């Protein structure tokens, strides 16, 4: 009887192990398919649509240099980010086996977070310039927008640097590792990780949200129909930034700071979905331009709202273009 019981226990253990392995394989397959579909769509549509936006905005630069400059800069940022998705696509396709070197592992993460920070900085500085800087001030500095855009890229280049330090290939996987000791997790490594994710939340999300909200309160009210349409589109791309990046940054911060009190299912399924959502941000802006503008020609860019504000300030009729 004892021998039969041992065989029964052994069979039960084997069945449990096989069940866990099947569940793990099924989970990995689902996550892999989510990434493959998302990355493929972002790579194809992100590169194509952002390239189209760059061409259109450059053609409309003479009619509306202010808006076209910011739209071009955003599209260029998202174009680069979309192009580098090819590494993540190949990574998911090869069952998360990284065979492309340590440098590309670091650069891929650096470009991703650089895109986030540059977008946040551009939308923030654009909001400030629209709320504070008037047309007369802009005339004194014709390259004011170019300077602000360059400043946005410089800020992003600095804030994304932790990826160059932490990202590395370990056991054929491209992961974040903030520990100097390769064999174990240290308190110093955990502290560095917490500092980075909190910094991304505060500077990448919270500060831009506050700046955009305050700028919205202080910006001039426009009665012009075209101005309103343009403002709605710009507002939509600002909201989209927080909707697409917010979950990933917030969940990553929670994972690093309060892991023990979180539901494991939330991180197991929520974080991969949030990561895919953040990746999709690179293509959402062109979609907003075309859908909200009801035209692939992006005619809403032809209107210069700064000139409209200047006419209003002088008490003249609204200027329609």
Where do the PLM segments sit?
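Seventh transmembrane helix
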Residues: 243-253, 270-321
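Class A GPCR helix-loop hinge within the 7TM core
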Residues: 114-150
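Extracellular TM2-ECL1-early TM3 structural module of rhodopsin-like
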Residues: 28-40, 66-126
